[in-house]
Amino acid sequence: MTATKQHKKVILVGDGAVGSSYAFALVTQNIAQELGIIDIFKEKTQGDAEDLSHALAFTSPKKIYAAEYSDCHDADLVVLTAGAPQKPGETRLDLVEKNLRINKEVVTQIVASGFNGIFLVAANPVDVLTYSTWKFSGFPKERVIGSGTSLDSARFRQALADKIGVDARSVHAYIMGEHGDSEFAVWSHANVAGVKLEQWLQDNRDIDEQGLIDLFVSVRDAAYSIINKKGATFYGIAVALARITKAILDDENAVLPLSVFQEGQYEGVEDCYIGQPAIVGAYGVVRPVNIPLNDAELQKMQASAKQLKDIIDEAFAKEEFASVAKN
């Protein structure tokens, strides 16, 4: 796409709880002028397209329809939420092999359509599937993006905001690493309206050190808590995806925590996709924002990346995946 293009087209692949919530977010936030929805359950996509179209009189004009893979050919953005859902007691990394097979089939068909836009991946394990989308598509790394730690960082900011009594939009803090159990909080750069969190807490005494540890654990494990209560998470990630979509379609050059390709931005972290802040616009990732990590944070980044890299290497050692890799 070009930064000045007026008609912006999104194709969503995967019309489950996350996908349909994302589609709803696009409609209510007036994002994009065209939305095609693909799923193996065709009647579901037809029903959702019809249902969503009934909201347009309250929002803004938009073409919404049940799409085919051939419709991807002129899309600006393809959003991948298709995959087996995470079950109670299951980690995101437990999903690897079955969702790699789904990812391979989906990406192959999208590329065959002539698609030349940007991939945004949200299916879990998102860092692994963003990497596999890059491998299977042959696309430049800048045009394959994962939702990464966007939701985790939002949860982190909201949790801190609730504790200290400010608007979450005034809290600037990131979760980095895997979107999953090995993620970590970048405490060294967390701030409230420009005041370092450490200084803020000294001045206001809103929470002690153990409270901060407990807060991070609640953020890291939030998905498990929600899955145990209602079976799946979808509203938060849907709005996170809508935010990323807007940044891309409107060429915002926004800084967002995403799953982006690693080629030595951090010592010992290479050839994987992992969560870190990045500038994103109409052409995908403009460049990663390499927050200087302290020694403890760097070790956590390296450990998180190693866990992902080991899984990637094991998966792509298998002929069924290695044989179709283009990158």
Curated annotation (Swiss-Prot):
Places the protein is found: Cytoplasm
Enzyme class, spelled out: oxidoreductase
Activation/inhibition comment: Allosterically activated by fructose 1,6-bisphosphate (FBP).
Catalytic activity field: (S)-lactate + NAD(+) = pyruvate + NADH + H(+)
Pathway entry: Fermentation; pyruvate fermentation to lactate; (S)-lactate from pyruvate: step 1/1
Any one GO cellular component localisation term in the record: cytoplasm
Subunit note: Homotetramer.
HAMAP family found in the cross-reference section: Lactate_dehydrog
Chain's role: Catalyzes the conversion of lactate to pyruvate.
Protein name per the record: L-lactate dehydrogenase
Organism: Streptococcus uberis (strain ATCC BAA-854 / 0140J)
Primary gene name: ldh
